[in-house]
Amino acid sequence: AEMRNFALRDAQGNEIGVFTGKSPRQAALKAANRGYTEIKLRERGTKKVHIFSGERVQVDKPAGAPAWMPDKIWKPKVKKEGIEKLD
């Protein structure tokens, strides 16, 4: 599977960043982990905008995690809200 590029759009429709991933969800998780909560990702080369709501929750690091990891880590969660089509 090819990596796909998803452009992050702000409320004004400006593309403010690019996240890569095999799926829109994977890209949305990366955006959520940077603190974005309303995530609109336009797939490069298409007119489709995938809309997610995102949040980060702080959790204990998993058992068996490497020692250099902090005890608390941020875990992104996203929920797909729908798809918009651009004209």
From Swiss-Prot:
Presence of the UniProt keyword DNA-binding in the record: yes
An annotated GO BP: DNA protection
Transmembrane stretches, start-end: none
SUPFAM superfamilies membership: Chromosomal protein MC1
Keyword line: DNA-binding
InterPro entries per record: MC1, MC1_sf
Entry-linked Gene3D superfamilies: Chromosomal protein MC1
GO molecular function: DNA binding
Record bears the keyword Aminoacyl-tRNA synthetase: no
Task performed by this protein: Protects DNA against thermal denaturation and modulates transcription.
Protein name, entry field: Chromosomal protein MC1b
Organism expressing this protein natively: Methanothrix soehngenii (Methanosaeta concilii)
